[in-house]
C-alpha cells in the first residue's frame, strides 16, 4: 500500500448492509422471507437520479469493486482499474452501486448466514438462486436507493449475464447494458468444468453434505481444487506460457510429486488463498446459477425472440484469447440483438490474458469502454 491513495482512486470506502423484509419469490419455487444485501457506492447521485450505474460481479466477486477499506489494504477493489475519477466508469460523473449478490459469502444473505428458522447457518438448505433472482433483488435495491432507471448496468463474465438479464426483465429501468467477456448460455464444456469443481468440493471429507459449519470445519482441499480448475480456464495458453513456461522452482527435477514447476506452485497458491476467503456452498450456488442461465430456453432456443422486450442500447465486448467465454459466444449475442433490431456496439479486443482480460486495463479496451461510458454520461447530463 502506498503512503497516499492514488489520485484516480475513489479513496476510502465503507460497505453498508441493507435489509429487505418483503419476501422474494425465487425461480426454484422457494422464497426468502427477508434478506440482506451488502453494498458499496462511489460518486454522487444527481438530483434526478439519472446518473446511476450498477456493477454486477462475477463468480468470485463481491461488493468491494473500487477503492480501499483502510490505508493498510495492499490492493484496492476488484475492478478499481475501471471505476474512479477519470476512469471508464468515472465517479466524477456517475453514482456507482456495487453489491454482493444473494447467496454470496461477503455479507449478503447466503449459505453461511443464520437461518432465522433454525438459528444455524443455512448451509445446503439455502435455496438455489438464478441470475434472474439476483436481478430481481437488484431491482429492489434500486427502489431502496431511489433509482428508477440505471444509466447503465455493467458486468463482466457472470456479471455480464446479469446485465443482459436486466434488459429482459426490467427493460424500462436501464438505458444501457454493458456485457463484457460473457455468454448467452454455457456450453457443455463449461458446464463440465463447473461439475468437476462441484465434485471436488462435495467429495471433500470435511464437506459434511454442506453442514461443515456445524462441525467448525471448512472443505478447504475441495475449494482449493475447484479454484485451481477454474483458474486454468480464466487464463490463456499463451499467457500461462509467457508467465511460467516450463520453469522449475529449483534447478533440477526431484522425481517426486510435490510442486516442481512454477505453474504448479502458482495454482496451489491461488487455491490456498481462495479457500481461506470463500465459502464452499456459495461456490456450488454460483456455478449452478451459471449453468442455468439461458434466456432463450423459454423461446425454443431463439435468443432474438428472448430479446424482444429489450429497450436499452448494448455494448458487447469480448477478448481474443478468452476460451472460457469465447468471442464466438459474444458474436452469438450480437447477431441475436441485430436480428431483434436492437441497438448494439461490439468489439473483440486483442489481448493475451484469456478470460481474465476483462479485469486488465489494456489500452484498446480502456479506450472503447471510456468512449462508450462518456456517451452514456452525456446522455444523462452527467
UniProtKB/Swiss-Prot annotation:
Alphabetical GO CC annotations of the entry are:
cytoplasm
Q: Name one GO molecular function term.
A: homoserine O-succinyltransferase activity
**Stored InterPro entries:** AB_hydrolase_1, AB_hydrolase_fold, HAT_MetX-like
Q: Where does substrate bind?
A: 227, 356
Question: What catalytic activity is recorded?
Answer: L-homoserine + succinyl-CoA = O-succinyl-L-homoserine + CoA
The site (Important for acyl-CoA specificity) lies at 324
Please give the chief subcellular localization of this protein. cytoplasm
Please list the GO biological process terms of this entry: homoserine metabolic process; methionine biosynthetic process
Give, as one word, the top-level EC class.
transferase
The annotated subunit structure for this chain is:
Homodimer.
Q: What is this protein called?
A: Homoserine O-succinyltransferase
State the species of origin: Marinobacter nauticus (strain ATCC 700491 / DSM 11845 / VT8) (Marinobacter aquaeolei)
Q: What is the lineage of its organism?
A: Bacteria, Pseudomonadati, Pseudomonadota, Gammaproteobacteria, Pseudomonadales
